[in-house]
């Protein structure tokens, strides 16, 4: 429901800007451009995960514009470790508010695409993100970056 509320504002804004009804194919396009194609300024390159004594350590390679970064975070879960890494790097207060995931395919198997939805509170403002991948961890990291990129893209 929280993502529907967030996205409805995007669709409403487009409808008001164009002063027209929004066609179904345009709604799909708006969703893709707002949540799935927000790969700037942060973009995921790779990640490495390790676990010891119940704590996950995550090393992520990212680009921020044309700058390559390697960040590390630690927490009692992969998502928490990534939020920790991004918070330490950015200096922003980042809190995971909502998290949901599911497969997009009815078929089981290694090639099933997963989607992850997140809502983050970044410095007191809420932003939603969506990530897609055949790797559920990668989908989660992409969703977090999608949300983090939202306010940064608004500034550009």
Which residues make up each language-model segment?
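Terminal or standalone catalytic/regulatory effector modules within metabolic enzymes
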Residues: 1-156
């Amino acid at each position: 429901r929280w993502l529907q509320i967030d996205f409805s504002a995007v669709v409403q804004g487009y409808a008001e800007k164009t002063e027209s009804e929004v066609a179904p194919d345009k709604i799909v396009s708006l969703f893709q451009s707002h949540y799935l194609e927000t790969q700037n300024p942060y973009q995921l390159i790779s990640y490495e995960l390790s676990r010891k004594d119940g704590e996950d350590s995550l090393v992520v390679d990212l680009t921020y514009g044309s700058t390559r970064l390697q960040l590390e975070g630690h927490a009692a879960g992969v998502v928490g470790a990534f939020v920790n890494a991004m918070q330490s790097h950015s200096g922003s207060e980042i809190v995971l508010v909502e998290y949901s995931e599911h497969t997009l395919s009815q078929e089981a198997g290694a090639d099933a695409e997963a989607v992850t939805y997140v809502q983050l509170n970044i410095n007191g403002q809420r932003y939603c993100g969506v990530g897609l991948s055949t790797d559920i961890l990668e989908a989660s990291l992409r969703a977090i970056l999608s949300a983090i990129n939202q306010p940064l893209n608004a500034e550009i």
